[in-house]
Amino acid sequence: MVQKLVRAAFIASLVCTTAGVVGVALFPAAQAADKVSKEVGEPLNAALEAIQKSDWATAMASIKQAQAVANRTPYEDYVINKILSLVAFNLKDYKTALTAVEAALASSSMPPEDKKDLLTNGFRLESQANNYAGIIQYGKQLEAIRPLDPDELSNLAIAYYNTKDVATAQQYAQKAVAAAKAAGKQPPQAALEITMNAQAKANPEAAAQTLEQIVLQTNSPADWDKLISVTFGTKGMTDVIAMDLYRLSYVTHALKANEAGLAGKLANQLRYYGDAVTILQSGGVTGPDLNSAKSNSAKEQGSLSAEIAAARKGSGQTALSVAEALYGYGRFAEAEALARDAVSKGGSKNPGEAQMLLGMSLVRQDKFAEARQAFISVSGNAAMTKVAHLWGIYAQIKGGSASGPAASPPAGH
């Protein structure tokens, strides 16, 4: 996104008018000999009046009148260039704006107190143009004058990354993340991505945690897909846990057509026929797997009422099996009730699955705070607790509290 140039100094403190002559109020009194002549001052005053009305075309026409005056002083050229940079920027003539900033910075008439704003504007214009050498040039000068904000640090990181100085890019990315957190803001996504890329080989777990921060900010299917794909390789992954991960992929809209085919086949194998139909159809998958899922789904739904009654009286595993079916058919309140029974009774073949299903059923009913607590309470191996952690992130996002960090996954046991 193009950042706005610093307008306050350009308009509020650049020029004041006395008897039709533009006088500059930027120098100390002892240096006030620099003035703008009436011939230059009148069109510049007209430009400033047009700027106040956001009439940029008129402002540019007035600046050109000032530029047409013969025998201008270096100070007059400095003032013209300073105003020109603002007007050209708002006319989206970024090349002219940058040229004007460069000329103002190079002027021997530039007041020292103007340097910070001019460097800031040069940095932003180079950032808008993706001119990495210019970003680095202005960024280093600006950093020597004042602390850089998270976005500026992130832009420097991007510039160094794209000029193949990965080590320096990582340093600025880390600074950007730290500065954002210190200010209570979300870190710039680019800084997180550069950090994650640097961590990928040396510290995969740290890279995954950084990717979680990105997902918390974007909630984009593409970022969810990256995070979920990495998680499939977690130690202890089983078919049941993988299915819970596919369910997450489905609700986050990260499930691709080829993955829908695999997920649907797995759902059929686990006898999650409702899930199989939903997932296969979502991916546009047709053929034997969908036909089988539809046939078995029709049979199962015809006997569900009896199965629910039996599950209420039966074991924890029986309650869990029926709850899984209810979840697949979108009957989330009933799935929640039986999942609670399964948690209470215990005896599941898959430790942690009853608690996991409880959390998923709560999420699908928009009970996000309860769901997060349910996911935190999931026990089991590393894969089970990791998948529960990701579902907890989803609940956190849907509950509107994604600005804070994700809760750490519980240790597997």
Question: Language-model features: where?
Answer:
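Generic helix N-cap/helix-start motif at coil->alpha-helix transitions
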Residues: 36-45, 74-81, 111-121, 145-155, ...
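Residue at a conserved register position within TPR or TPR-like alpha-solenoid repeats
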Residues: 50, 88, 126, 160, ...
